Amino acid sequence: MELKATTLGKRLAQHPYDRAVILNAGIKVSGDRHEYLIPFNQLLAIHCKRGLVWGELEFVLPDEKVVRLHGTEWGETQRFYHHLDAHWRRWSGEMSEIASGVLRQQLDLIATRTGENKWLTREQTSGVQQQIRQALSALPLPVNRLEEFDNCREAWRKCQAWLKDIESARLQHNQAYTEAMLTEYADFFRQVESSPLNPAQARAVVNGEHSLLVLAGAGSGKTSVLVARAGWLLARGEASPEQILLLAFGRKAAEEMDERIRERLHTEDITARTFHALALHIIQQGSKKVPIVSKLENDTAARHELFIAEWRKQCSEKKAQAKGWRQWLTEEMQWSVPEGNFWDDEKLQRRLASRLDRWVSLMRMHGGAQAEMIASAPEEIRDLFSKRIKLMAPLLKAWKGALKAENAVDFSGLIHQAIVILEKGRFISPWKHILVDEFQDISPQRAALLAALRKQNSQTTLFAVGDDWQAIYRFSGAQMSLTTAFHENFGEGERCDLDTTYRFNSRIGEVANRFIQQNPGQLKKPLNSLTNGDKKAVTLLDESQLDALLDKLSGYAKPEERILILARYHHMRPASLEKAATRWPKLQIDFMTIHASKGQQADYVIIVGLQEGSDGFPAAARESIMEEALLPPVEDFPDAEERRLMYVALTRARHRVWALFNKENPSPFVEILKNLDVPVARKP
């Protein structure tokens, strides 16, 4: 059927289209120079209008586009419109049945996801959204018309809800799932550890996101959560023991975790590993070789001897090396270097040995060629760093030669080899769930190992437990931003905060939390105490009062109560401790550096050495170009890592903390603590 404009209407309308023809499933409008085909699957509405003389047809298309036919005789226009409209609606009714079937399939998919007694991840909801969008793009009708049809309307609205407010639907589902799990497994959460898990701990355990960061403040029971998570995966049948990988940062921590798992889960099938042990396993399985870790890794004296011998050789045999080293040590390090053959000076050798060891270690950790190291350095120090690398290159070569002679590898080499084996597909990861302790200590190299494992199976979950407030190992390569920007580095997921500490009282918590959160770069989180503490729970005291303080403690501290004396450095050990065994024989006193105290706790803590200067706390920045180029960037906030070290010291105590300061030359931290209403006592 065809509709044409009248001769006069055509002339007066001056419009590109003057005729229309109904097709099988569409309509064609045309003129002398133009033609436009409108398929029914793009047609939203047809309007028939009457002007002063002639009729007008209006075809509404997506994106607010309208095609018009003017100048037609009104009676013919009406007849054509009724015929076209009936044809279009018959076609639309047939197509709505197809659309209805597709929409019902999407509802079935949604029901499958939400009906399962499982956590709904962001990744899964994104997948459902993508599938719905793909299905809608394949519908025979424009989605704008779905509201018109009774057989499509309800299903379309449900699909729209998933497209528009998916996060709300996901949260609602997961909240219901979590409550159901906490009820169904109430006995498990009561018994899995020596004390029942609190709600925040239990919620972290059942969270099923593929990338989950559990922020565990000091004393909040992170080990309990890790053990419970492993037990939960077994209890739910979500993993077999061999599909769970539990990672710790040190051998001692791994052994303690193993013991806890045996004791609480009654299984020896889950074994905690260090990153180095994991790398060793991957290399053994992926290359059928059994690498030997160099004896030098555990022999500091032998390493120092190796590096000093090579350094002396280079300086004595090559004038350029001797000149370069003299310049480095005097200009950058500002050391006093003897005239003449300075490399033979034993005092200088002793001082330099640990530095050479550290710098070679940083180069090994980087793992790249010299050109790559130089290219990755900040531009403003790149030229100078290039000179330093050339001076260090022979020492790195000597290290590699020593490894070759021993037919061994070093720790950094282990992880690099493991990553290569994973990337080449020579080892297929059996682990569905990776649980990592002390995640704030992770380095880029270890993060790359985790990424290589997860790349093999996109469904592998990462359950990372850590505390950015206790990130104190940048000097060994740890990069705090891997925790603070967790999801940027490890993929979409969630964060859970363990909000209760079982260690210290509310006053210690208040001071420590406010102190650390003055740095806006630290993640904000709640950390509440179960016990109250008075204002004296944290006290500033002159360092001359240490003996008097220990005298007072000897009067009321119980024999089983531990007193921990902490300092920034080993050599800050108070002289008073030499007489402790006889003067305070009933006191259980331990001394350690703050770094060594990580993971420890005591009833009473005494922090010594709060002074300014070369041996001060906070420690002055003493990084060379090597550290600046090869370690993660220093944070903008002043003394950020030293502040975290102070937080660690404060939070070792259950009952009381005394911060002993130098009255003549106090640490900047003293003034900060005063501003947090920490009292200054004249005597204990």
Swiss-Prot record:
<feature type="binding site">
    <location>
        <begin position="216"/>
        <end position="223"/>
    </location>
    <ligand>
        <name>ATP</name>
    </ligand>
</feature>
<keyword id="KW-0378">Hydrolase</keyword>
<dbReference type="InterPro" id="IPR000212">
    <property type="entry name" value="DNA_helicase_UvrD/REP"/>
</dbReference>
<protein>
    <recommendedName>
        <fullName>DNA helicase IV</fullName>
        <ecNumber>5.6.2.4</ecNumber>
    </recommendedName>
</protein>
<dbReference type="Pfam" id="PF00580">
    <property type="entry name" value="UvrD-helicase"/>
</dbReference>
<dbReference type="InterPro" id="IPR027417">
    <property type="entry name" value="P-loop_NTPase"/>
</dbReference>
<keyword id="KW-0347">Helicase</keyword>
<dbReference type="GO" id="GO:0043138">
    <property type="term" value="F:3'-5' DNA helicase activity"/>
</dbReference>
<dbReference type="GO" id="GO:0016887">
    <property type="term" value="F:ATP hydrolysis activity"/>
</dbReference>
<dbReference type="InterPro" id="IPR014017">
    <property type="entry name" value="DNA_helicase_UvrD-like_C"/>
</dbReference>
<keyword id="KW-0413">Isomerase</keyword>
<keyword id="KW-0547">Nucleotide-binding</keyword>
<comment type="function">
    <text>Helicase IV catalyzes the unwinding of duplex DNA in the 3' to 5' direction with respect to the bound single strand in a reaction that is dependent upon the hydrolysis of ATP.</text>
</comment>
<feature type="binding site">
    <location>
        <position position="503"/>
    </location>
    <ligand>
        <name>ATP</name>
    </ligand>
</feature>
<dbReference type="GO" id="GO:0005524">
    <property type="term" value="F:ATP binding"/>
</dbReference>
<dbReference type="GO" id="GO:0005829">
    <property type="term" value="C:cytosol"/>
</dbReference>
<dbReference type="Pfam" id="PF13361">
    <property type="entry name" value="UvrD_C"/>
</dbReference>
<dbReference type="GO" id="GO:0000725">
    <property type="term" value="P:recombinational repair"/>
</dbReference>
<dbReference type="InterPro" id="IPR022161">
    <property type="entry name" value="Helicase_IV_N"/>
</dbReference>
<keyword id="KW-0067">ATP-binding</keyword>
<feature type="domain" description="UvrD-like helicase ATP-binding">
    <location>
        <begin position="195"/>
        <end position="505"/>
    </location>
</feature>
<comment type="similarity">
    <text>Belongs to the helicase family. UvrD subfamily.</text>
</comment>
<dbReference type="GO" id="GO:0003677">
    <property type="term" value="F:DNA binding"/>
</dbReference>
<dbReference type="Pfam" id="PF12462">
    <property type="entry name" value="Helicase_IV_N"/>
</dbReference>
<keyword id="KW-0238">DNA-binding</keyword>
<dbReference type="InterPro" id="IPR013986">
    <property type="entry name" value="DExx_box_DNA_helicase_dom_sf"/>
</dbReference>
<dbReference type="InterPro" id="IPR014016">
    <property type="entry name" value="UvrD-like_ATP-bd"/>
</dbReference>
